[in-house]
Amino acid sequence: MQELLTLQPIVRVNGTIHLPGSKSISNRALLLAAQALGKTCLINLLDSYDVRYMLDALHKLGINYCLSIDRRSCEIDGIGRPLRVDTALELYLGNSGIALRSLVAALCLQNKNIIITGDKRMKNRPIGHLVDALRQGSAQIHYLEKDNYPPLLLQGGFYNGDITIDCSLSSQFLTSLLMMAPLASQDRCIFVKGRLVSKPYIDMTLAMMKSFGIVVQHDQYKIFYIKGKSQYRSPGHYLVEGDATNASYFLAAAAIRGGTVRVTGVGSNSIQGDIRFADILANMGAIIRWGVNYIECTRNSLCSIDIDMNALPDTAMTIAIVALFTYNGVTTLRNIYNWRIKETNRLVAMATELRKVGAIVVEGKEYLSIKPPNMFKIAKINTYDDHRIAMCFALVALSNVSITIVNPKCTYKTFPDFFKLLKGISIT
């Protein structure tokens, strides 16, 4: 039987949210620290399903670490070299895209048989562009069920020089190559084919690699120059920023039904591109204030917007909900075709669920247009086991109707405390 959570109408939000660690940073930091020379203490690590999958995989790969009781700090004994195993094994990564993809690349530098797999949805998320690039470097990779999708059998072999990667579907393919390439035996260039989606995530990856001692040069994100036979070095302590994507839900709540909400743990100096969500809210009319370690949002009249969201696909979903509360016209989110290969087909799912609450929605191949409802409808929201759909549609409770979320615990993928924190700033 499916679990349901009904949220009653929220009259006002006000308060401060201390953000848990970023999922994207947490999993990158774990992999970098594991391969770095020296011991690294990760602070404000996220405790979620995606991070636990990465930790479990690293344990199976022989990495020693010690978690604090609350799992928010982790001390890792880095091995100072690429990951290796003494025997064949299988790694299960659930539906964690960054964990699975980054480990696929990292484990092409060793020569034991390793099977990498995930849940049903992960087996329908394409990985062919990454596999094609790794095979250019002589990596031995075999599809075990259907071409271009996990599960995969890895047999090592990555060696040869320059490679070309298609990043039109996911920047995680390039991130995976960038983090692996310095540990390979040769210098190389990585050429980016086509349009690079979600470019801010590449900036995040490069900033984190720099913190672990590796600097990568690039030419306008088209060519990346990697020095081989390099070594990651522990920074000693590494602070995981609060999750800027998850901050978007609370900033949006304030823009819709504030009061004022401040999110802490992320601010003007963040390495996360999703902090730019606050600028989009400001362009829609919200009042935004910045600090080094916080972003604050106060309610104001919100207008519709027509915007290319290719760089910020996750927070584009939050904008789709904000669009329900605008006072004029239609909001159009463009260039979001890669929504279709996320945790679910988010273009179809968002269009379907937005219509349930009364919006008039046009779903194109690469865009979504949303006209606010004349009157909000009480609805039961299918989440498709997608954490972001659950969190986005919780904000519909900021209207004058209740909203029911199916399978609310899907948020445990990246934000187990989401509903608790939302309740803490809400007046019903």
UniProtKB/Swiss-Prot annotation:
One MF annotation (Gene Ontology) recorded for this entry: 3-phosphoshikimate 1-carboxyvinyltransferase activity
UniProt signal peptide: none
Binding sites annotated in the UniProt record for phosphoenolpyruvate: 23, 97, 125, 172, 346, 388, 413
UniProt-listed GO biological process terms: amino acid biosynthetic process; aromatic amino acid family biosynthetic process; chorismate biosynthetic process
Keyword Transferase: yes
Catalytic activity as recorded in UniProt: 3-phosphoshikimate + phosphoenolpyruvate = 5-O-(1-carboxyvinyl)-3-phosphoshikimate + phosphate
Residues that coordinate or bind 3-phosphoshikimate: 23-24, 28, 170-172, 198, 314, 338, 342
Keywords recorded for this protein, A-Z: Amino-acid biosynthesis, Aromatic amino acid biosynthesis, Cytoplasm, Transferase
Active site: 314
Localization per Swiss-Prot or TrEMBL: Cytoplasm
Leading EC class: transferase
Pfam families with a match to the protein in the record: EPSP_synthase (PF00275)
One cellular component term from this protein's GO annotations in UniProt: cytoplasm
UniProt pathway annotation: Metabolic intermediate biosynthesis; chorismate biosynthesis; chorismate from D-erythrose 4-phosphate and phosphoenolpyruvate: step 6/7
Annotated EC: 2.5.1.19
Domain of life (superkingdom): Bacteria
Database matches in NCBIfam families: aroA
Similarity comment: family membership: Belongs to the EPSP synthase family.
Record's function text: Catalyzes the transfer of the enolpyruvyl moiety of phosphoenolpyruvate (PEP) to the 5-hydroxyl of shikimate-3-phosphate (S3P) to produce enolpyruvyl shikimate-3-phosphate and inorganic phosphate.
Subunit record text: Monomer.
Protein name, per record: 3-phosphoshikimate 1-carboxyvinyltransferase
Organism name: Baumannia cicadellinicola subsp. Homalodisca coagulata
GN (gene name): aroA
